[in-house]
């Protein structure tokens, strides 16, 4: 429980640091703000801006078997939603199942789906002082992110049709031995790739 909450908290700090202050208010989705078709799912939270709705919900749309195959326990799911007047993030965090004695106690993973665009995410990450490596994943623009002020953590932001999917992972050490920065992100791209494959299927059937 501690690792999951810590992972979610640290990711939220990193994501929200580059965003303007807000009232943290949300529109109640019991009354949809705009008419929707019978095939459109209204997000659990919506904001008051004219941004796109957050279509992909990590808490609802990532199958348990995908999380398990990636090395995370779906039973440890913990909500990490955030709604402001001007943007929305839907997400959850999970405890990892991989344990390497003397090296890795476990991983903590957070997945947030947001409706600010890729360039806003890039600017936010730069403003946070992140070390950014632009890359691509499954044909999508992506950013690999580390930050010396958040040791043993690694992030990846992937462009979506409505905004970005933001991943944050923390390596909880199983000893006091330091972990070289070059190893902070080992294996994260594989995890992200598995979930982005789910996103690909979701977006292809939602058009």
Tell where the protein language model's regions lie, with residue ranges.
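Bacterial N-terminal signal peptides that target proteins for export
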Residues: 1-9
